[in-house]
């Protein structure tokens, strides 16, 4: 039930619209009115609201998961990372909640029983707390009330402070624990990230045309150079592009001071401040750029450049350049991170690549947090190309981001510039897709399939070969090696069909050898096929034991043999080695038509093996180059 009173300061009508409301800010004179039953106390004036790019308004109604709510109050809270708008909402069923806005992100949180929670000093960024689905601590600090508007169900005063811990849980869950000024939790708010559309407030963005505070022009107090603040309601640091001075911005530019006169720009940004880029179907504006590095000393540091992009509805993202390679980086929900030697996120497994201390060396443009030159964070990168998962932590914060590798040509197209204007690529990037990896598996499958086909063809051909002549050649008694008496000439035999002709000889050799000078002659034409064959088998023993080598078998292949009647002529020579007394008396001869040659099959297999082997080698070399830059080089 609403309750109307007159403002003790200006006399204007002030309405407490909700029974639970304790304080109300007079919209006319900004007096803070405290309600105690029917008595109204004037607690003094509160400061004017700091201009922010929020699209929300008091009295605006929306709905979440089917339940309607109304925005009844706002608290502007100073956090270490900047100013937050925290809107108090009242649901139609009597529940209360908060709609928190910071750096373009919104979280809807409901009041819940804090239950058994760890003490404030036990909440460490990057670690999970017991209970509450093992949510991860992502931010701890002290919050300060700057100013208020509307009505609130708790007695808050400007300047009031409290300890807090922000948590992230699975499936987008988010929570804030309020510890008051001590160690024990006094309140907890649980919910998740939400867009204007999910809150039933999508019309605000459309009606406002994504309105934001106009850019403001000012002068650098050091060099008097002209500066433009594109986000005057959010920016906390501005680095002069002319002299490098880092400026601290208080509120909405009521004061500017030189924060670091030594911030000399050590790199040439690839894009001008204010440049626009069309990425993923959205137009982003370059707000700032910084160079960061890691390494054991100033002489052995590894540097890269990060460009801060902004879009009024989607907030912020980074475009990172590292040795001519580019990644688009967005904030990721740390509550969905599965820890371990490897990381699991978004259904993907990420392998550890490198851990380091990342330091801010130089910067230009504006930033929505109090960045400083020399600022150091503990960083770790995990990769699943083309994705890279990055963790950065300090004593008070844990940030998770997900990057995606993009080609230089796509970056150039996004900014409408020529690709050669961008830094030239060097080496292999941690998240760069391996151009060969997707081809290795299919190529080996292709090799196995084709090999199987060739083997089947070979075996099928072998079963279709046939013997056209076979005999045992007996040497005449007393015949001398190489003499005309030892020459063998067969009876005529028919060779039909097509294909090659194989002549195969087997002799029972023992420390002896056999050489044959052969001729396959057509009896009705002058076509003659000449060939030579040699077999030898040797054995013995030495200090290493018994040994043997060679064989009593020899083969010769003849090609281009047309069908017809043929005779086989063999002129043998033979001999023994050492003290062998075995005398060669005979040998066997076989002539077959259409015998596939295993050597041809082997050559074919080697040739088709070369392509997948080369691609595999290139893929392996690419991965070797990638991991040579990691903490696991050589492992």
Map each language-model feature to its residues.
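Envelope-exposed proteins and targeting segments
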Residues: 3, 216, 305, 514-516, ...
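Mixed-charge, low-complexity intrinsically disordered regions
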Residues: 1-497, 574-635
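Beta-sandwich interaction modules
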Residues: 488-494, 542-562
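Extended, low-complexity, turn-rich repeat/linker tracts enriched in Gly/Pro/Ser/Thr and Asp/Glu
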Residues: 508-514, 575-579
